[in-house]
Amino acid sequence: MQTGRDEPILEPDLPIIDAHHHLFDRPGLRYMIDDYLTDTRAGHRIVASVYVETLAFARTDGPSVLRPLGEIEFANGIGAMCDSGRYGCRACAAIVGHADLQLGDQVAKLLDQAMERAPERFRGVRQVTIEDPSDVPYRFIPNRPPGGVMKSPGFRPAFAHLAARGLSFDAAVFHHQLPEVIELADAFPDTTIVLNHCGHAMAMELNATARERVFHDYRRLMIEAGLRPNIYCKVGGLGMPFWGFRFEERRDAIGYRELAKAWRPYVETTIEAFGVNRCLMESNYPPDGRSAGFVPLWNALKYIVRSASADEKAALFHDTAARVYRIRVPVAQPGKATST
């Protein structure tokens, strides 16, 4: 994990809702609430966060469709603890739980029980659907997702249950799968889809010419996705190996300017495609910690958009996430207290 906590904090007073992070305790990798709170106290003003599923703490018995409730209950407990205000950041203020949408109408029972158990925080579901014809990216994916999830017979019947409950869908795909997300958005215009990680250009182990070709295709597809008003996009996830930056191979501390230089084309493409009112800044911690310390990561995102107006920065770093995930947290302003 990169650290880089000695960097000066850019715009330290800017309120941030971290739109995407995880907590888990796995062999060889433990990142729990104390670890996350340590990162949030490093200088950036993280006021709240969105917990996103990794099937951590899922139940190990009972009906398979309901097993994700274990993780939702775990995250809800953390959210309740942090909502006391004793810990600074209101971590897990919103929860995106797991659902196996291949199970069709059975998923309705999971959604209803999740809403009963975490009514103030459960806001949507995610099912990782990334696919690639090569085996290269799967070296970094602990549990290889099944193929063809979005085309499975049960997927759309399950997906149809989200909008009526006011729930969103977090889409985790590679860039070449964006046509499937676009098709889904067109078929369900009343369902909010939140694209993860800047659309996730898959460019591992490619030469410069091939990377340029990937970026051209990526940009075209992102602009097309941005034409759908019900698709939003998280800005981050750029510290993962799939982008091909190879920062994860480095042992020296990587500063925010170097990160910003590499990440800028993808961040700018995302914001151009979706606009600030449909973009949400994320840490994607701890996965992005392979390449970027928590402080340099947020510094890099701030640096890339440094020319944006105050209102645009508020939307990118706080307001869009608050609106999409219905998060209400007190934000102390200099000389007064307000709520968002």
Name these PLM-found stretches.
Residues 146-280, 291, 309, 334-339:
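Catalytic pocket-lining loop regions of alpha/beta-barrel enzymes
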Residues 1-88, 299:
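An N-terminally biased module of ancient metal coordination in phosphate/nucleic-acid-related enzymes
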Residues 22, 55, 100, 128, ...:
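Catalytic metal-binding/acid-base residues of hydrolase active sites
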Residues 20, 49, 75, 95, ...:
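Conserved, mostly hydrophobic/aromatic
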Residues 63-177, 183-186, 199, 208-214, ...:
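Active-site gating/metal-coordination segments in enzymes
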Residues 12-15, 44-48, 87-94, 118-123, ...:
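Short, well-ordered coil/turn segments that N-cap beta-strands
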Residues 1-15, 19, 31-39, 47-48, ...:
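Mid-to-C-terminal alpha-helical segments outside catalytic/metal-binding sites
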Residues 25-27, 57-61, 103-106, 132-136, ...:
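Short catalytic/ligand-binding loop motif for oxyanion handling, primarily in non-cytosolic enzymes
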